């Protein structure tokens, strides 16, 4: 997700802004956006839980963390929009859902449910701020791919290095080395 988000940012910068008439266009069909988000959420279970290639505890943990993180992110996005004086919306709920899926993907099978709630909560706030920043910048990323996928993927990878078993949170030198590998992966 980090690489696709950064590629989208590079593409948006390279292509420049759209014509003014298409920039302020409202979403055409909100029910289809919600249907798409629901189908993404459903498909993501196979993506995260199926990545273990076994029907074991890791797959169950990935499944549970995927659902928990997405639900947490959806509610966090709506709540943060309300805190910032914006009206809660179905579009915001759909974006929050996708941000939660992106945020938990690197660590879905390797963190506890409580950690997945924390990860998705923090990353959702960061992505919400990134979407706000993008909307006030000269970058024309029509689908907010960088603020959601790029930012969520980058911080999801960093937080994975902190929270996985044997990661930075373990307090050992080996955990510090694991965390540095995650930082290096983000930079590269």
Where are these regions (language model features)?
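Hydrophobic alpha-helical transmembrane bundles of multi-pass membrane proteins
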Residues: 2-188
